[in-house]
């Protein structure tokens, strides 16, 4: 399958103006970020405020970059006024789309004419779910747990069934291409809530899975021999060395995890994926080339 660089969107994470500038100058096509308490990194990463939205949009538009606002936590009744205020401001300031998982947020965004992208928190894992949410969204983040053949089957199904979003275009598949992975299905983890009373599903993950642990048999007290002590911490995702297969499965938006990361990290990762995409377009992408990008 042949690819044009312009067909693929690199979406970069930003938690500061430094990261925003780094993403833009590294070649990102879009950026995503959060404001306030209604996003999945509200307490574990830097966040902007509603008053920052106009400036963010202005900077991004100057460089032809789209802006996506994450409003993707679990919402309770007491959160709905803040959700509406956030989305009203996003609409007024010209945010390109909001990334949402709660149905209340999805419905409100659509009611005010704000474009919706379906968040990974909805764990979309099959074609029927994609077909259902197509009435609300043109872009959907599929579950990270899917295999490449499973993603390809959904992509083929979208085309065969002509599944289109509100703008009349075929639904586009977005997937995480790089960054940290959660030990729980699509981030639905309860460790922080159980241990610290802080819900990861409300943006307050305490990263307990990133700590080192000893594993002991409670019956005899023997410690189990494991490769490392980070028994609950998955290896970070990196698709640059099988990017051709990833795109061949139908992924058109490459999402980079890392709103808590530095501007230098954002710049380097975006540059790597931009370089890989240009190599794919030029026909110079090889395993050796990809391995060099990972170094």
Q: What spans do the regions from the language model cover?
A:
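Conserved aromatic-histidine-acidic binding/catalytic patches
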Residues: 142, 258-261
